[in-house]
C-alpha cells in the first residue's frame, strides 16, 4: 500500500504556468459570455448596482447592448475574480425581489387593461436569467478547463513527485497523468475531471441552505428598510410595502401592505425560485465523500502527506476532516506548500485546527 498522499490544489497548476485562477476564468467569461458577468452583477453579492438604474429598461440595455463596454461593479471584480464558488452563495434576495417588483404590472387583476402575460413575464424572466446564469457559468467553466495548458518551458520547474503515491486532486485538469505520468488509478479527482461530461464537474458553494437562510434573516431583520413602518419623503408613516420585507420579514402575510394581490402571488413564485437556487447550487461534499469512500479507506497506511498549491479554504474542510479521520495522525508527517506570507498564516490555522505540525515549503 502507498505510504505517501499528495493533495493537489489549483496553485500546483499555476506553478507550472497554467492560467487557472478564478480571475483568469472571469476574463474568459468577459470575452466569451459577458452577459453572465452582467447578470452576476445584478443578482449576486451585497452591492447596490440596482441603484444605478432609474428604470428596468435601463437594465435591459445593460444586459443586451455593448457588453464589452459594460462597467462592472467592484464586488464582481473582487469576488468573481477571487473565489466565485464561495460567492455562488451570495444570490441577493433583495436585489431579485426589487427587480421583480419593478417589472410587475401596476394595475389590478380587475382592470380591463390587466394581462396575465404581463404578470407572468417578469417572474419567468428573472427565473430564467438566474437559471441561465448558473447553467451557462457551469458550461463555460468546463470549456475553460479544457483550454488550460502549462506554459512553455514548464518542464524545467517540474517537481520530484513520487509516482507510487496516492493523489487527491482538487483540480479538474489531467496534468498529473499527461505530464507527470502518474497512473490514473492512483488519482482521486474529487470534483471530477475535464474528461467528464459537460455539467458534471462538482462546482458550488458549501453553505447549508437552512443555516445560511437563518443567518441572512438575523443579519437583516433589524435594518430600517425591513421594519413594519417606514417614512415617505414628506415624513409621513406608511406600512412597509417592500416586496423583500413582505416576503421574508412579515409574519402574518394577510396583514401586509401588498397594494395589489398579484404582488403576493409573485413573491411566492420568486421566493421559491431563490430558495430553490440555494439548494441546487450547494456543493454536497458529504455525498462526494461517500462516492469516493474507497479512496479514503485506502489512507490507513499513509505516513506522509504533502499538500501542494491548495488554499486550505473553508469550503474544502469537510474533505480534510475525512482525511484526518482516515489516518493515524500521530504517525503522519505533514508538508504544506505556501506562496505568500498570508499562506503561512493559513497553514498555522490549519495545523491548529487538526492538532498537527507541518513543514511549510515554498512553491
Briefly describe each language-model feature range.
Residues 19-29, 182-186, 322-323, 352:
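Short secondary-structure boundary/capping segments
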